[in-house]
Amino acid sequence: WYLSANLKSKLSLNNHLLPGLEPLGVPKGLRNSVLPFKFNDFYDLEKNVKKKAKYCAAIVIEPCREKLPSKKYLKELKKIAKQNNCVLIFDEITSAWRTSTSGIHMDIGVYPDVAVFGKTIANGFAMGAIIGKKKIMQNATKTFISSAFWTERMGPSCALAFIKKHKQLNIGKILIKKGKKIKNIWYKAAQNAGLDITIQGIDPLASFKLNIKDWRTGATYFIQEMLKKRILASDRCYANYMHTDSLIRKYELACFEIFKKIAELEKNNKLSQSLEGPPKQMDFGRLTN
């Protein structure tokens, strides 16, 4: 359903979340069935969402990714959904469990009609969960839903154990603390190397970009040199409970060293020559306003 937005124009999603997507294999009958809108943008809310909501069955958004949204914006979105009898759905697959033992909408204080969870909810095991208001969820009983895994217990068991442990250890608070440390490492390493840096994301879901001539090459070099130190890293970091102080310290030393190398190579126009393979592919990008 998401890709169907690009049936009308291949550029429909370029300023949304995932630019560079081809709607291959998507039935043409879904053309005009999805209308993208800009997240946390009040102008677009007035111009498009309010006008088109009456034609829609649901409004689906991620409540947060790169940064926390305006609470006022989410409240207005909820108001529009209610006025037009739309179901407001929050995709919490990425944002949940990062800052507290629940979806991030609980921290923001705006509650959707339906929320979707996955991945982290079972700490990596295959598990998903959909929660919502009774009058909406009951409609699922009128549809055909089948599965070969009705009696599978691993996913639910892992999810219950994860949620219990998450709450017991206050993991959200820990992830925020670790994420702040990582962001600070990037900032200080860039300052030390004389590089300009852009850091984005909420603390547990952070990313960085060194503002050099060719960041695609720079990011590839960073990954390459980190691998040599037996560190699997990229230009983003999803904070983890098992990121111990000693591991973070090892990562810090590596960042200082590699950022300095990038600065030197960039200065001497030798960064691309220092790659031991092709630069990372960036055709399938992820951008969030």
Question: What is each PLM-predicted segment?
Answer:
Residues A58-Y73, C86-I108, V114:
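Conserved PLP phosphate-binding loop immediately N-terminal to the Schiff-base lysine helix
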Residues K167-L169, K177, K228-N289:
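PLP-dependent enzyme catalytic core of the Aspartate aminotransferase-like
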Residues D41-K47, P63-N84:
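Active-site core of PLP-dependent enzymes with the aminotransferase class I/II
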Residues G179-K183, Y187-I223, Q273-T288:
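Conserved PLP-binding catalytic core of the aspartate aminotransferase-like
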Residues F162-Y187:
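Structural signature of PLP-dependent enzymes
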Residues W1-Y55:
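PLP-dependent aspartate aminotransferase-fold enzymes
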